Amino acid sequence: GRRLCQHVDRVRLLEHELQAGLPTLDPAGEARVRLPVAVNADSLATWFAPAVAAFAASAPVLLDVAVDDEGHTAEWLRGGAVLAAVTASARPVAGCNHRPLGAMRYLAAASPAFVHQHFADGVDAASLARAPSLVFSPKDELQTRWVRRLCGQHVELPRHTLPSSQAFVVAAAAGMGWGLHPESLIAEHLRQGTLVALLPNLPLDVPLYWQHARATSGLLDGLTH
């Protein structure tokens, strides 16, 4: 079913561009085409919306954005639910174009009071096994990856689940737990001291990629650029 939906979306893109080339097919010039995209929440909360706003304002499209973990957005593309995705997958999906976007830098951070309460003796496997952490969803492995990099072993983390990038920041600043946050999203909190980095010299950089269906479409190309 999803494959069929993706095929229909591609056909609609091509039909729209045919109409654009032959105005008599759409004399009102009001037809808009649906463009389904999958994006990870942190990209949506930081750079994605500003990056596509100008395109969405000038092109006859209606963006339909689905949110999922960056490690799973490629599945939306592979399954045919979307025509493009921001993903952490370095492997191109079959039938798709693939280009690197750069890396999103994450810092482990918490409120000063939380750090004093849970990490007064340092950030190590023992303290991390006791201190509540924040995760976006059961799919979110960023905290686990950062801990494994720090400790060289798996640590079972107590966790609160908060499926919102903004709620992550608010909860951390309120002392609910520690978590991995996009550096750009918490920069002001770090400057004001409402959040502190657990280990400032141990960021986690997550490479991101843009993948989109290999359809001959000026709209997809416009969104990509």
PLM region spans:
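Central regulatory/effector-binding core of bacterial HTH transcription factors
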Residues: E30-A94
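A late-sequence structural motif
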Residues: W47, P200-H225
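Paired acidic/hydrophobic, glycine-rich loop segments that form the ligand-binding mouth/hinge
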Residues: L83-T87, G177-H181, L198
